[in-house]
Swiss-Prot record:
PANTHER family: 3-ISOPROPYLMALATE DEHYDRATASE (PTHR43822:SF9), HOMOACONITASE, MITOCHONDRIAL-RELATED (PTHR43822). Its EC number is 4.2.1.33. This is 3-isopropylmalate dehydratase large subunit. [4Fe-4S] cluster binds at C349, C410, C413. Keywords: 4Fe-4S, Amino-acid biosynthesis, Branched-chain amino acid biosynthesis, Iron, Iron-sulfur, Leucine biosynthesis, Lyase, Metal-binding.
Length: 470
């Protein structure tokens, strides 16, 4: 009667404070992913205490937040960004930690390179000083983000003090309609339960629609679990999982592979498992989604309208909508497809994998971006994704359409590097957060799938991507 979360949790409890199932425990961590933003203070504290990382073989490091996505031959211009990247390089060199440096082809966004390298394996506990570590739960992992002090704890002890979450099952049954993607499922779920709906929970995604997703799609879904307030998101292991991992650099080989696969096939919730909460959606009812406000829960369908605060009875919610519309520069009851755009960003740890780029390229092939689009950019999630896309000719498709083809990194997902919105600019983005100022002070972000972003770039405004593929 165990859920997948229960199995992963119990397998990693080193010590329990009491018999209380909701009490604090010491949890063992299998894989520690590290980037340049949340690790410098952790390493510094470790050194001041005269300690060394306990198990360097569990760590994989990469710089992603601050790296430029344009020409890298002259290095990083911003002194703070440069210092963070150089500090990561120095710490990894000092402690013999595996790191993919800025000019290594394997460099990329930490939540792209972990699975890509086979460093994320079913049954693991995976942590990183980054909110969207939940991405790795797509591999039947218990994966979650941690703070800088916890990064130090894991470096020093390979363990964390933690409290068990409640469990939520999000079941999506049926076949997804053409033009509807994992990103649309994620936004539809968040629209249904809200950004606080998953608070205190670990979400497992299941159902025939989820099983039909590729690993890239499952990663997108689990990546967005944190935006529903959840501690973690996960999908049970199956043959899709196993096929994706096989042959990757960090994956087990030979007899160890056979042993691992036998174990991985057990990593799913039992048929009679009991969850604390269940949410059910029918795939056939899900349409392409577009956020209109300043929170991922402020979302509607592409054929929908901006809400009217006058129709909302709850005064707090009404105020939130009024404030969001003011910031976003939108009018009540405005059709989503009348929202014009300035920029388009295809990338981030949510949607920068090869499947995402293929979907966007399919839409823009043989077309040109609209005259009002000041910048449309594609930022692959890793050097290996970029190389694969170039071998398939996707870069030429994007360049011919008027897109910029960039180097891998977090890029315009957040205003921590040179890629950002100017005040008042409006962007269709495949990233995960549309908070005020997320992509730059005063920037206005609308979250969509890669295909929807590509279609918006061509039209100059939001348009139903389904009209492109019929």
């Amino acid at each position: 009667m165990k859920t997948l979360y229960d199995k992963l949790w119990s397998d990693h409890v080193v010590h329990a404070e009491s018999d209380d199932p909701n009490g604090m425990v010491i949890l063992y961590i299998d894989r520690h992913l590290v980037h340049e933003v949340t690790s410098p203070q952790a390493f510094e504290s470790l050194k001041l205490a005269g300690r060394k990382p306990w198990r360097t073989g569990s760590i994989l490091a990469v710089a992603d937040h601050n790296v430029p996505t344009t020409d890298r031959s002259s290095g990083i211009s911003d002194p703070v960004s440069r210092l963070q990247v150089e500090t990561l390089d120095q710490n990894c060199e000092e402690f013999a930690i595996t790191e993919f440096r800025m000019n290594d082809e394997r460099q990329g966004i930490v939540h792209v390179i972990g699975p890509e390298q086979g460093a994320t394996l079913p049954g693991m506990t995976v942590v990183c000083g980054d909110s969207h570590t939940s991405t790795h739960g797509a591999f039947a992992c218990l994966a979650f983000g941690i703070g800088t002090s916890e990064v130090e704890h894991v470096l020093a002890t390979q363990c964390l003090v933690a409290r068990k979450s409640k469990t939520m099952l999000v079941r999506v049954e049926g076949d997804l309609p053409p033009g509807v993607t994992a990103k649309d499922i994620a936004l539809a779920v968040i629209g249904e339960i809200g950004t606080a709906g998953g608070t205190g929970y670990a979400i497992e995604f299941a159902g025939s629609a989820i099983r039909s997703l590729s690993m890239e799609g499952r990663m997108t879904l689990c990546n967005m679990a944190i935006e529903a307030g959840a501690r973690a998101g996960m999908v049970g292991a199956d043959e899709v999982t196993i096929d994706y991992i096989k042959g990757r650099p960090f994956a087990p080989q030979g007899a160890l592979w056979d042993q691992a696969v036998a174990y991985w096939r057990t990593l799913k919730s039992d048929e009679d498992a009991v969850f604390d909460r269940m949410v059910e959606l029918k795939a056939v009812n899900i349409k392409p989604q577009v956020t209109w406000g300043t929170s991922p829960e402020m979302v509607t369908t592409v054929d929908g309208y901006v809400p009217d605060p006058a129709d909302i009875s709850d005064p707090t919610k009404r105020h939130d909508v009024e404030h969001a519309l003011g910031y976003m520069g939108l009018k009540p009851k405005m059709p989503i497809q009348e929202i014009t755009l300035d920029k388009v960003f295809i990338g981030s740890c949510t949607n920068s994998r090869i499947e995402d780029l293929r979907a966007a390229a399919e839409i823009v092939k043989g077309k040109r971006i609209a005259p009002n689009i000041r910048l449309a950019m594609v930022v692959p999630g890793s050097g290996l994704v970029k190389s694969m896309a170039e071998k398939e000719g996707l870069d030429k498709i994007f360049l011919s359409a008027g897109f910029e083809w960039r180097e891998p990194g977090c890029s315009m997902c957040l205003a921590m590097n040179d890629d950002r919105l100017l005040p008042g600019e409006r962007c269709a983005s495949t990233s995960n957060r549309n908070f005020e100022g997320r992509q730059g002070p005063g920037g206005r972000t609308h979250l969509v799938s890669p295909a929807m972003a590509a279609a918006a770039a061509i039209a100059g405004h939001f348009v139903d991507v389904r009209s492109f593929i019929r």
